[in-house]
Every structure is written in C-alpha cells, then in structure tokens.
Regions:
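Signature of N6-adenine DNA methyltransferases within the class I
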Residues: 1-95
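Polybasic, glycine- and aromatic-enriched phosphate-binding surface used to engage nucleic acids
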Residues: 68-215
Length: 215
C-alpha cells in the first residue's frame, strides 16, 4: 500500500485515544492515500505522542508509533534472530509444566520482571536446542537468558537472537535490557502488544544500535 501509492498523511493513536474515540482500549491509525506513484514524496505524520514530522516512508518496513526519525536509523539489513519455533508450544502434549523423568528437557516460556518461567519437554528435537542464543519473552524484554551451549529450548512465546560467544551475549543482553532499547521496542508494539519478532530480521548490528542510542 505504501510502496505502490502516495501516503500524504498519517495519524497514529494510542489506547487512550482509542478509549476517547471508540470507547475501547485499542490503538488505531488513520491515513490519507492518493492513488499515484510514490516518487519519494514525504508523508506528514502525527505520532502517538502528538509529534509532527514530515519524511519519506517508502523504504520503511515498519513505522514505529513514535520517535520515528530516530528509530528509522536503527533499521538495517541484518537478520539477528532465529525464525519463530513452534515445536515445543505450551499447548502440546509433549510439553509439561512439571519436570520429571519423562519431561526433562528445559523449555523457556517467559521472562518476566520477577524472573524466568520454564516448561519441560519429553524431547529435545528442534526448538533451537544446540543453538547459541540469547532468549527473552515476546511480552517484554526482562531477564534475558544467555544459552551459549544450546541446552535450553524455547516455547512459542520466546524470541531467540543469534550469538557467537558468551561475551557477545552479555553485550547484547546489556543493550536489550537498556531503557532506550526497550522504548524502541515498545514503539514497535502494535495490535496485540506482543513484541514482533520479525523486527529483529531488519535491524542494524548491535554495535551500531548501541552507538545510535548512545547506550
């Protein structure tokens, strides 16, 4: 839609505006599009903080809810994330809440402010076992788990980023858990409030992210 037409105007609204407008706690946007070639035209945008900017969005894969000009600098062509894995989904019979002799393979299910929550599988096939990774829940980046040895699997609610060493894992963990990066992720939270794991398929590397956000 954006690439094939000229988006003249875009307004982004948060849940507070949703309550005022629709009596419903939902985010919403509205926009004005002209059926013509984009030709690198600039779009007037009012973000959900009521900031007004004018910029070319034709090459943007995602439009954050706010601070768009800054966050535009973070997007790149590095695929930092493993594809989402559903092998050990929490609803499957091969997964249990209780660890025992049969269900002995640890599965990370969530990372809350209070700590990690684990499930247990009766097998360690797929599920990103044997992959070096840093892991966190899709409901919020808290208490990231570094699994360089690949001993832990993941449920459907875990995002796993690629790492090459424990040192790199710790560096990425510090960036992920920094408030500035969390603000970026929150600005990219849309309909269901879950973190969109695909964002990590199109970012700059973490050294560049750290520099841009001044972490």
């Amino acid at each position: 839609m954006i690439k094939n037409n000229n988006m003249i105007y875009l307004e982004i609204h948060d849940t507070k505006d949703g309550l005022k407008t629709f009596n419903c706690g939902t985010k919403y946007d509205w926009y004005l599009i002209k059926k013509e070639k984009q030709n690198n035209n600039k779009t007037i945008i009012i973000d959900d903080k009521n900031n007004k900017i004018k910029m070319n969005i034709s090459n943007m894969k995602y439009i954050p809810n706010n601070n768009i000009e800054l966050y535009y600098k973070l997007f790149g062509d590095n695929n930092l994330v493993y594809d989402r894995c559903y092998t050990h989904s929490s609803t499957k019979k091969t997964v249990s809440k209780i660890e025992n002799k049969e269900f002995k393979y640890k599965i990370l299910h969530s990372t809350t402010q209070k700590g990690e929550r684990y499930l247990y599988s009766n097998n360690n096939k797929d599920g990103l076992f044997d992959k070096s990774k840093i892991m966190f829940g899709d409901s919020g980046i808290n208490n990231c788990v570094i699994d360089f040895e690949g001993k832990i699997g993941c449920s459907e609610h875990i995002i796993c980023l690629k790492i090459n060493s424990k040192k790199e894992g710790n560096k990425i963990k510090n960036i992920l858990e920094n408030k500035k990066f969390k603000d970026f992720i929150n600005a990219c939270s849309w309909s269901n409030y879950q973190i969109n794991w695909k964002i990590f398929k199109s970012l700059k590397n973490f050294d560049e992210i750290k520099k841009i956000l001044d972490i």
